Amino acid sequence: RVSDTLGIERYQSVPLYLPEDTLTAERYGRDGALVKLLDDSNRLFRIQTIYTNGEWLVPGKYVKSIADSVTFDKAIFVDVTNQNIATLEHAGSKWLVRSMNPATTGQHRPPYAQETPLGIFVVQEKKARMIYLVDGSKETGGFAPYASRFTNGGYIHGVPVNAPRKSLIEYSPTLGTTPRSH
């Protein structure tokens, strides 16, 4: 797999160009990452990211503008070090913690398992059931309930249910221990 110097893979990513070199992408930006849009008047939009310094140019087709009037009233924080997840909701002038739970983040086991990426993302897609395959095959391995895709192949989801089981699993004793997901 092709990746940049920060380890961000080209697959399902956005090319980031330096303002002085628009022929070859210098880095890759994560799909779904929240960025600051500085100028959208040309084919290449000028942006700033939270994880790299400076300004970057990105093809406009990869940028979904969010109006200044849009506010976020829900947030999810994933602690990859301590294997926890917290959900918050903005109510009035306060952010309320709605839940704090043990979680299992992504493990490094290429080519199928990837670490949970760090960053600030906007949810790209929601699925009641995310069907997954057995690694390296086209055989259905099971499903993960309540899946929200935030970047590339990264999802926040409920406890995976391996086939042939069909009923939901509410809790797993491995949650909050070590990175196990992919």
Give the location of each predicted region.
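Surface-exposed intrinsically disordered loops and tails
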Residues: V2-T5, N162-T178
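Gly/Pro-biased beta-strand-loop elements
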Residues: D40, P59-S167
